[in-house]
């Protein structure tokens, strides 16, 4: 899917957490209803069959419970998308990325071929529909997640190019697929953050480490031979740049991808480089924007939400620009776009006990008009307000309420913006207050069963707060838009 990802190492975050976050976006002209749920080991089959590619994969024993963001409407696969398992390992998948004809000609994508005449069908590989479901219930560390997914890619292949993030309390790893069966992965340095639009991003790779100590780099078993045989290394100095070797530098990237990376890097490092003007080090169309940077200050969840909601505020490219030169207005693809399905920010807090370490921040619909809210991830069930999404528009769940707020606020932007700013701050503040309150209760409780009940009680309280504030905001935004109707008239009846 068309998405945007941010990864924050533990030394770059405000509290020592590892944080991984992704906007999950539908393709143009589509919207996908999502629900926040828990998948239990007994719900997993012995053999997995993909709806889209028809590939069948036997699943191992020893599964773990995990949270997920599956599609609310059945029929096109699970698309679990993002979650945290019972071992406090987080995963988000996938960020659709780009490739080039040299790679795809050497290792074609493994696409499903339907039966034709007397020829039987040929299953395809794995894809975004499948990846979280196939990996997250079976791993106990971020590195283990890379190795399991890498093994599946080598055995079954994939029909699309994807980037996938894994985290535990100590590490974050980022994996990128290369062609049908190859892959690379890099450990995110502790003191940096990573920004990822929809293109292959890793810009340095140490093959010696990947085939040696494997401290910071991992890859498919025959990657070195694959590169040499197909003349993929374009460097003049022998330092492999995966972005040049395996990625793209298309004109479309300069409208759809590089501007997003430019804006996020500019936000966290405004003084490190010159970002605008004739003497700019980097522009929205630069192909060499860094994959990772050390931020100028520590990064908070609120920073991540702002970046993943952005539409180039403060630049000539803002689609909501209402003054000055508007010639570049809306020139680039926004990060907070109309077709954001959800955003999940997974936070592993090192200063909390393992049982309550993982917090999952959730937002639905267009990030430019929503708010995110924290929930304890180590639970048996999620609140109904976030889990009861269906394909029918309704105001008794967070997904559809968020969609309605976004559509109406977009149409009444200048009038509704302050309602949205107050809504977001109120939910973030109240959500943090409730987590702080229940962290203290959990620390004081010695009984494990009671602590489990407290985590679910906390999530219920957070959801109740959220539902009240979302309904209030919907009411206010509806009023603003109703007041702008074309059949309005200023005189009241006598």
State each model region's role.
Residues 312-313, 317-444:
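Substrate-recognition/cap regions that form aromatic- and gly/pro-loop-enriched pockets
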Residues 6, 145, 344:
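Short, conserved catalytic/metal-binding motifs centered on acidic residues
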Residues 2-128, 148-280:
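A contiguous strand-loop segment
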Residues 225-351:
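Glycine-rich, aromatic-lined ligand/substrate-binding cores of catalytic
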Residues 138-147, 151-160, 314, 350-353:
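Secondary-structure boundary elements
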Residues 118-121, 131-139:
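Second-shell loop/turn segments in exported
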């Amino acid at each position: 899917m068309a998405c945007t990802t941010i990864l924050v190492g533990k030394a770059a975050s405000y509290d020592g957490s590892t944080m991984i976050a992704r906007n999950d976006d539908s393709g143009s002209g589509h919207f996908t209803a999502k629900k926040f749920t828990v998948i239990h080991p007994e719900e997993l089959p012995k053999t997995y069959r993909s709806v889209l590619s028809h590939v069948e994969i036997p699943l191992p024993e020893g599964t773990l419970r995990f949270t997920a963001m599956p599609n609310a409407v059945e029929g096109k696969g699970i698309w679990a998308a993002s979650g945290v398992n019972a071992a406090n390992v987080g995963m988000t998948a996938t960020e659709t990325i780009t490739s080039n004809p040299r790679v795809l000609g050497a290792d074609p994508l493994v696409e499903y071929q339907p039966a034709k005449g007397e020829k039987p069908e040929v299953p395809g590989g794995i894809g975004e529909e499948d990846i979280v479901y196939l990996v997250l219930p079976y791993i106990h560390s971020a590195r283990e997640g890379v190795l399991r997914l890498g093994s599946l890619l080598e055995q079954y292949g994939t029909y699309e190019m994807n980037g996938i993030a894994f985290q535990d309390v100590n590490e974050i790893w980022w994996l990128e697929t290369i062609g049908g069966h190859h892959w690379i992965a890099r450990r995110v340095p502790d003191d940096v953050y990573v920004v990822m639009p929809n293109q292959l991003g890793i810009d340095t790779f140490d093959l010696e480490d990947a085939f040696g100590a494997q401290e910071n780099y991992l890859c498919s078993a025959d990657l070195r031979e694959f590169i040499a045989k197909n003349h993929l290394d374009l460097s003049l100095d022998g330092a492999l740049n995966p972005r040049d070797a395996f990625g793209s530098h298309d004109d479309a990237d300069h409208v759809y991808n590089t501007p997003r990376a430019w804006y996020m890097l500019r936000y966290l490092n405004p003084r490190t480089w010159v970002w605008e003007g004739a003497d700019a080090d980097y522009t929205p169309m630069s192909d060499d924007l860094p994959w990772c940077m050390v931020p100028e200050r520590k990064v908070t969840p609120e920073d991540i939400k702002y970046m993943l909601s952005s539409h180039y505020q403060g630049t000539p490219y803002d689609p909501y620009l209402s003054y000055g030169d508007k010639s570049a207005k809306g020139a680039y693809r926004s990060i907070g776009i109309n077709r954001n399905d959800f955003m999940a920010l997974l936070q592993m807090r090192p200063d909390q006990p393992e049982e309550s370490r993982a917090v999952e921040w959730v937002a639905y619909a267009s990030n430019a008009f929503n708010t995110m809210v924290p929930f304890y991830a180590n639970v048996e069930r999620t609140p109904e307000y976030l889990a009861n999404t269906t394909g029918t528009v309704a105001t008794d769940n967070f997904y559809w309420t968020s969609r309605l707020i976004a559509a109406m606020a977009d149409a009444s932007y200048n009038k509704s913006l302050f309602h949205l700013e107050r809504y977001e701050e109120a939910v973030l503040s109240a959500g943090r207050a409730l987590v702080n309150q229940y962290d203290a209760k959990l620390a004081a409780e010695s009984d494990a069963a009671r602590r489990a009940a407290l985590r679910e009680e906390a999530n219920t309280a957070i959801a109740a707060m959220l539902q009240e504030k979302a309904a209030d905001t919907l009411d206010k935004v509806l009023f603003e838009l109703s007041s702008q109707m074309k059949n309005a008239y200023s005189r009241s009846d006598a």
